[in-house]
Amino acid sequence: MNTQAELLNTEGDYSLVSWSGRKFPGLLVQGDSLSILVETLAEAREELQKGDADEAQYAVDMALNTARSMLEAYERMMNDAGLNLPYSTE
């Protein structure tokens, strides 16, 4: 399989990458950023299992903020590249 990728833009730890065979570019996330997100979600699950709703909520909020920052970076880079999003924002 010969797939070609093109780096369209980079913002912080995230990059917008287009590759052959895909209609829309994807978001490349650094491995450490992805690992931190997974660890935060695992912490939320652990706190829920312990019955500590406040700590679980805090961890979920942190993970949601991280995911939102990824989505916002993706949307800005898509806009900067003059590309439509693959989903509706309404």
Question: What is each stretch, according to the model?
Answer:
Residues 6-7, 19, 27-28, 77, ...:
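Generic ordered-secondary-structure signal
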Residues 1-9:
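Short N-terminal "domain-start" leader segments
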Residues 11-46:
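A short, structured beta-strand/loop element
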Residues 45-90:
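Short, charged, surface-exposed hinge/linker loops at domain edges
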